[in-house]
Amino acid sequence: MSRPLLQLALDHTNLQAAQHDVALLQESVDIVEAGTILCLTEGLAAVKALRTQCPNKIIVADWKVADAGETLAQQAFGAGANWMTIICAAPLATVEKGHGVAQSCGGEIQMELFGNWTLDDARDWYRVGVRQAIYHRGRDAQASGQQWGEADLARMKALSDIGLELSITGGITPADLPLFRDINVKAFIAGRALAGAQNPTQVASEFHAQINAIWGAQYA
């Protein structure tokens, strides 16, 4: 396992506000995500603007692609994304097409685990070359009071055992990180916990301190 990264999720409804938060936090995070809401509002301009603003960061196009994997991957990676998300309900052919473009561009596909999916699905994604997935506690689940539980951790461990690296998101705070010490974590994704904090850079420092305390220098 490698040391987990810290990802800033930008689910703003306008690009100017997103770029304001990036200006505050880009030196404190490893990955900058053009979130689904931002991309639906601003289109490809969101990915292009973030690439220009953050030339040395990993940029994620969180598009949750369900079809047209090849065409949309060409758009995402052509705009400057390093990673693009595909929704878990997408046909395997869509995953394969998107992954093929990602490989040709030096990028990666992340499978977005919303709704219904199985470990057999995960094995299929791994078989066609995908190595990343995103494990969610969605906005609506958080609002209803759903917490991280043993069932979540067991599913994450099973995905890790298949060989997938997981980005974990859903109201994550630094205090939550010890729950995931046995998981193959690629990144912790925080949006409002970072951008909405009174002192965003301090919260980012707390994330990094907790990551270092749990995973340590041996994973650096």
Feature roles, as predicted:
Residues 27, 79, 128, 182-183:
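Structural motif
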